[in-house]
Amino acid sequence: MKLLALGLVAGFAAVERKGFLQAMLSRPIALGAMAGLVAGDLDAGLTVAVPLELLWLGAVNLGAALPVHEALGTVAIAGGAALAAEVLRAGGAGGPALLPAAAAAAVVLCAPLALLGRRAERLVERWNERLYARAEHDLALGDDEAAARVNLYGIALPFAISFLLAPLGALVSATAIPLFLERVPGALPPLALGLVTLSAFSCAAGAKAMRAARAKLVYFAGLLAGLGLFAATVLAGGGP
Amino acid sequence: MKEGAPRVPPGALARCFGRSLFLQAAWNRRGMQNLGFAYAIFPALSALYADKAVRREALARHLGFFNCHPYAAAAILGGTIHHEEKVAAGLEPPGAPVAYKATLQGPLAAIGDGFFWTALRPLFGALAAVGTLLFGWPALVLTLTIYNAIHLVLRIGFFRTGYRRGDDVVGVIARLSLPAMAERLRLAGAGVCGAAAALVAARADQVPRSGALYAAALVAALGYCALARGAPLFLAAYAAVAVGVGLALLTHLFGSPL
């Protein structure tokens, strides 16, 4: 049931990111939360949503260029992390490192789906050329309403691809991650730190995606100011 | 417009705008957003051309190539309806709406991509990420609500202005100074990403591994430099995970290196 819900969320996101509305609902930050929610673990969704949003901040459709399919990757990763953590908890595992470790492992396993999604999108574009031909055909037959309506048929294939692939990725994560972590419980803290370093790198990727001439300067200024503020808070006894 | 000239009723205009949200539903390499544009403008054509043959001809001219930023395209859709009304009234030749689209799609695509896709949306993405780190999901909901309030107000405004002003929409959009604003938003976004990196590092201090804070700060700094030198994003991301895992293993084996 959760896999079906993940499929529906992924399908909706695949349509929203390009074919309909584009209101940031298919961005990793929103989608990770939604995927986590339908998989029964909002925290897991938010844990991956933040680094994935920043990592793929530059994933935008500019002209005919195709970015990675960040929506497909996000649902698979967030769903996989949530389901894997659920299996691990059911097996008696726990502790603060469990969720970040499951999230890091889900990123490692499912991030390539974002690349696969981009390839699939190329196929969709070719398929849509057939829809163009169909619209011309309908118009030649005199059915202008049918010719105009053809546009909506373009929604089906992106929906179907993500509906199938995202739950599949989540299922692989939910199976492989608990298997690995139950056999190698010592991997939990290293993977948790892996998520921290990935998150830190994602911030750099986000700043780089800003495409501003002085972005580097402002990014490092923000980083240093933030660290300085943190150090001052710790020194003042406020704690992290 | 002369007295009694055909006008598109408000209901049909609203349907056109609603349909424009599906502009890229069947994006294809040959006509790009052509199917979406034809779908969006169809209610207006139905209202203007009762004669089926004339309407078919009108739809055929909108099945030609079209590509623009999906938000900014609302202005062109509104303006094209404006021109179609003139065509229906006999004030312009049938080629006028097509020429209007061809003239505006490039410049408005550049403005839309530059402002929305590479400035406003990334900034709100970064803000949502930082807000979620600090305050959880309510900050996420609030950020998305603000973004969409801006997005929808501009999108609807573009459509209305295009419809009412026709060719003058260019001047109206130019007065918004979106490219200059975009540069400031991008810089703000970079600053927010820097603050996010500091926040991630500060929170790393809570991970039960000494040196996590330093590792996060170092990766945030070196990561930017690596990307600036052309490192591929995916490989660099995997390397970042490997750094964290490797550091934790080293700490486990040899004690804290930092």
PLM regions and their residue ranges:
Chain B
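Soluble N-terminal domains of membrane-associated systems
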Residues: M1-P93
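Transmembrane alpha-helical segments and their cytosolic interface motifs
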Residues: A99-T132
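Structural signature of hydrophobic alpha-helical transmembrane segments
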Residues: V141, V200-A216
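Alpha-helical transmembrane segments of helical membrane proteins, especially in multi-pass transport
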Residues: L154-F158, R175-Q206
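Juxtamembrane boundary at the C-terminal end of a transmembrane helix
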Residues: V245-L258
